[in-house]
Swiss-Prot record:
Descriptive protein name: RNA polymerase sigma factor RpoD
Similarity-based family: Belongs to the sigma-70 factor family. RpoD/SigA subfamily.
Gene3D superfamilies (UniProt xref): RNA Polymerase Primary Sigma Factor, Sigma-70 factor, region 1.1, Winged helix-like DNA-binding domain superfamily/Winged helix DNA-binding domain
Biological process per Gene Ontology, one example term: DNA-templated transcription initiation
InterPro entries per UniProt: RNA_pol_sigma-70_dom, RNA_pol_sigma70, RNA_pol_sigma70_r1_2, RNA_pol_sigma70_r2, RNA_pol_sigma70_r3, RNA_pol_sigma70_r4, RNA_pol_sigma_70_non-ess, RNA_pol_sigma_70_r1_1
Chain intervals for the UniProt region annotation (Sigma-70 factor domain-2): 403-473
Sigma-70 factor domain-3: region residues: 482-558
Known DNA-binding region: 597-616
Species the sequence originates in: Neisseria gonorrhoeae
Key words, A-Z: Cytoplasm, DNA-binding, Sigma factor, Transcription, Transcription regulation
SUPFAM superfamilies in the record: Sigma2 domain of RNA polymerase sigma factors, Sigma3 and sigma4 domains of RNA polymerase sigma factors
Length: 642
C-alpha cells in the first residue's frame, strides 16, 4: 500500500478515533515498516490521532517502532542504502506477529502516565511468569544463538587468529582463563542430558533465605573454601583449554596453508574450517569475549561499508555515473584494481570525469583489498558472516530480554529485604537488575533447577556489593562489611540473652578474635556524620561550629598575646634606642629569629663583650618595679595555665 493511499485513508474521517481504530492504524503502520524496513515521520504523524499532542507519547511510539528494527527517517532512503544494509526481508506472517506483540505496549501510550517509575511497575506486572519448560525453551534459544555466533565468527580466519592469541596469553598467565572461556563442553555428556540419562548436580545451588543475617554469615564462612575451590577449578579449566585449543591451532595452520594454495571455496579448506567450527562449538566462551570478537568483526564490516559509500559518492555525485550501472558493475569488482582502467577504456560519457578521480577511487579500493588480505576471505563472504552474526545477536538479545522481563518481580522481592541500608530502593532495584542480567548470561538449564533459584544468588550478590561500595561515604572493603555485620549480629544476640551490651573483651571471646582487632573493627564501624548537620530547631548553628579547631588560637589567648605585645613595646620604648634594639635582636622580638652576641656586635660594629654589657644593663632596667610589675601579670596567667 502506498503512502498516498495511507494518507487518504487516515484522513477520511474527522471524528475521534476509537481504541480499535488506533490499534488498526498502528498495526498497519508496523506491518508496512517490517515489510519495507523503514517508516517516515510523516507516515507516523498520519497514523496518530489528531488530538495527540504530548511530545513524550509520540517519542515513545517512535522509540517502540525503532526497537522493532524499523528505521525511522525523515525521507525514504535511497535504493543503494537499502541494498548495502543487512536488513533482511520479513514475511507477512512475521510482520503481523511482531505488530500484534508491539501493540500491547503501544496501548499504554494513549492517555496514560509517562512517569518512568509508574511505567516500570505497570509494564513489569503485564509480563507473565515463566514455567520451567518456558525457561528451558528460552535458554535453548540463547544457547543456539551463541553457537551460531561462534560458528559465524569461526568462519573468519582473522577471528580464529584473535582467539588463538588470547589462548597464548592464557598460557603465559597474562590473563585469567575464565576471562575468555567459561567451560569446555563434553558432547557425550550433553547427549546424555538431552536423552534424560545424565545425572543432575549433586550439590544444589544455595537456596534463598528470608533471614539476611544468616545469608551474610553463610557467605562469610564459605568464602575461604570457595576461593580454594575456585583456584583449583581454574587450574583444571586452564589445562583443558590448552589441550583443546592445541588441536584447533593445528587445524588452523593446515587451513591457512590450504587457503594460500587454493581458495576459500576449496573442499579441503572447507573441511578444516568445519572441523575448527565443531571444536569451537564445544567451548563455552565468556559472554564478554563473544561481544569483543563480534565488535571486532562488526568494526571491519562498518569500515568496508564506509569505503563503499565514499566510492559510491564519488562515482554518482562527481563522476555522474548511472546508479544502476554502478551497482551492477562495481559491487562484483569491488577489490579489482583494474576496474577503473577498464571503465575509462570503454569511452563512456563519464570516462573523462572518472579519469580525474582515478587516484581517489584506487586509494579506497586498495584499502578494501588490504582488508580482504587481512581477513583472508572475500568482502562478500565477510559481509555474509557479519549478517549471520547480527541475526544471531538479535535472537540472543530478544531471548535474554524475555527472560529478564519475566523475572523483574524477583529483583523487587529481594531488594525489599535490603532497604534502609544506605541506598535508595530504586538504586537497589537497578543494581539487582544488573545481577539478573549476569544470571541470564551464565544460566545453565541442564543442571536441573529453575532460573529463579539460580538468579537469586546473583541478584543478592549484586545488591550487597553495591551497598558495600556506595552506601557509605568512606568505602569499607566487602569482607570488612561482612565482619561488621557479624559483630553487630552477635552483639544483638548477647543483648537479648543477657540484657547487657557486650564490651570489646566479651566480643573478642564470642567472635574468637583478638581484642585489639575488635577495637579496630568497632572504630571502623562508626558512621561518618556531616559537619553541616543542623543543631537545634534553627538552621543558624551546625555541628561544625561546636568542634574545637586545635590549629586556631583561642580568643582569650589571642587577647592576652595582643596585650603582651603592646606592653612589651611600651616598656622597650622606655629604654634607650640602642638598648631596645639589642634586646629585640637578642630575643627575636618583632623579628624572624633571635641573634647571637657576635651577630648583634657586627650590626653595631662593636665587640661581643660590649653587646653583653649593654644587654645586662638593659635587663637590670627591666627588673625595676616600675617596669617589671606591668609584665608580672602575664607571667602569673601563664603559671595558672600550667
Amino acid at each position: 500500500m502506498s503512502k498516498n493511499q495511507n494518507h487518504e485513508e487516515y484522513q477520511d474521517d474527522a471524528r475521534p478515533l476509537t481504541i480499535e481504530e488506533q490499534r488498526a492504524r498502528l498495526r498497519q503502520l508496523i506491518i508496512m515498516g517490517k515489510e519495507r524496513g523503514y517508516i517516515t515521520y510523516s507516515e507516523i504523524n498520519d497514523a496518530l490521532p489528531d488530538d495527540m499532542s504530548d511530545a513524550d507519547q509520540i517519542d515513545n511510539i517512535v522509540s517502540m517502532i525503532s526497537g522493532l528494527g524499523i528505521q525511522v527517517t525523515e525521507h525514504a532512503p535511497d535504493a543503494e542504502d537499502i541494498l548495502l544494509s543487512d536488513n533482511a526481508a520479513v514475511t507477512d506472517d512475521d510482520a503481523v506477529e511482531e505488530a500484534e506483540a508491539a501493540l500491547s505496549s503501544a496501548d499504554s501510550e494513549f492517555g496514560r502516565t509517562t512517569d518512568p517509575v509508574r511505567m516500570y511497575m505497570r509494564e513489569m506486572g503485564q509480563v507473565d511468569l515463566l514455567t520451567r519448560e518456558d525457561e528451558i525453551i528460552i535458554a535453548k534459544k540463547i544457547e543456539n544463538a551463541l553457537k551460531n555466533m561462534v560458528q559465524a565468527i569461526s568462519a573468519c580466519p582473522g577471528s580464529i587468529a584473535e582467539i588463538l592469541e588470547l589462548i597464548e596469553k592464557i598460557c603465559k598467565d597474562e590473563i585469567r582463563v575464565d576471562e575468555v572461556v567459561e567451560a569446555i563442553i563434553d558432547p557425550n555428556e550433553v547427549l546424555r542430558n538431552e536423552l534424560g540419562l545424565g545425572h543432575l548436580e549433586t550439590t544444589a545451588p544455595e537456596k534463598p533465605s528470608n533471614d539476611n543475617s544468616d545469608e551474610n554469615e553463610d557467605d562469610e564462612e564459605s568464602e575461604e573454601d570457595a576461593d580454594e575451590i575456585s583456584a583449583a577449578n581454574l587450574a583444571e579449566l586452564k589445562q583443558k583449554v590448552i589441550g583443546h585449543f592445541a588441536q584447533i591451532e593445528k587445524d588452523y595452520k593446515k587451513m591457512i596453508g590450504c587457503l594460500e594454495k587454493h581458495h576459500s571455496r576449496h573442499k579441503d579448506y572447507l573441511a578444516y574450517r568445519d572441523a575448527i567450527a565443531n571444536k569451537l562449538l564445544e567451548v563455552r566462551f565468556a559472554t564478554r569475549q563473544i561481544d569483543s570478537l563480534s565488535s571486532s568483526l562488526r568494526g571491519k564490516v562498518e569500515n568496508i561499508r564506509k569505503l563503499e559509500r565514499e566510492i559510491r559518492d564519488i562515482c554518482l555525485d562527481r563522476v555522474h555515473m548511472e546508479r544502476d550501472y554502478f551497482i551492477q558493475n562495481f559491487l562484483p569488482e569491488i577489490t579489482n584494481l583494474q576496474w577503473i582502467e577498464e571503465e575509462i577504456a570503454k569511452g563512456r560519457v563519464w570516462s573523462n570525469a572518472l579519469d580525474r578521480f582515478r587516484h581517489a577511487i584506487l586509494e579506497k579500493q586498495t584499502e578494501l583489498a588490504d582488508m580482504e588480505k587481512e581477513t583472508r576471505i572475500s568482502i562478500e563472504e565477510l559481509k555474509e558472516i557479519n549478517k549471520n552474526m547480527v541475526s544471531s545477536e538479535k535472537v540472543s538479545a530478544a531471548a535474554k530480554q524475555e527472560m529478564i522481563q519475566a523475572n523483574l518481580r524477583l529483583v523487587i522481592s529481594i531488594a525489599k529485604k535490603y532497604t534502609n541500608r544506605g541506598l535508595q530502593f530504586l538504586d537497589l532495584i537497578q543494581e539487582g537488575n544488573i545481577g539478573l542480567m549476569k544470571a541470564v548470561d551464565k544460566f545453565e538449564y541442564r543442571r536441573g533447577y529453575k532460573f529463579s533459584t539460580y538468579a537469586t544468588w546473583w541478584i543478592r550478590q549484586a545488591i550487597t556489593r553495591s551497598i558495600a561500595d556506595q552506601a557509605r561515604t568512606i568505602r569499607i572493603p566487602v569482607h570488612m562489611i561482612e565482619t561488621i555485620n557479624k559483630m553487630n549480629r552477635i552483639s544483638r544476640q548477647h543483648l537479648q540473652e543477657t540484657g547487657e551490651e557486650p564490651d570489646s573483651a566479651k566480643l573478642a571471646e564470642l567472635m574468637q578474635m583478638p581484642e585489639d582487632k575488635i577495637r579496630k573493627i568497632m572504630k571502623i564501624a562508626k558512621e561518618p556524620i556531616s559537619m553541616e548537620t543542623p543543631i537545634g530547631d534553627d538552621d543558624d548553628s551546625h555541628l561544625g561550629d561546636f568542634i574545637e579547631d586545635a590549629n586556631n588560637v583561642a580568643p582569650a589567648d589571642a587577647a592576652m598575646y595582643t596585650s603582651l605585645h603592646e606592653v612589651t613595646k611600651e616598656i622597650l620604648e622606655s629604654l634607650t634606642p640602642r638598648e631596645a634594639k639589642v634586646l629585640r635582636m637578642r630575643f627575636g622580638i618583632d623579628m624572624n629569629t633571635d641573634h647571637t652576641l657576635e651577630e648583634v656586635g657586627r650590626q653595631f660594629d662593636v665587640t661581643r663583650e660590649r653587646i653583653r654589657q649593654i644587654e645586662a644593663k638593659a635587663l637590670r632596667k627591666l627588673r625595676h618595679p616600675t617596669r617589671s610589675d606591668r609584665l608580672r601579670s602575664f607571667l602569673d596567667s601563664e603559671d595558672s595555665k600550667l
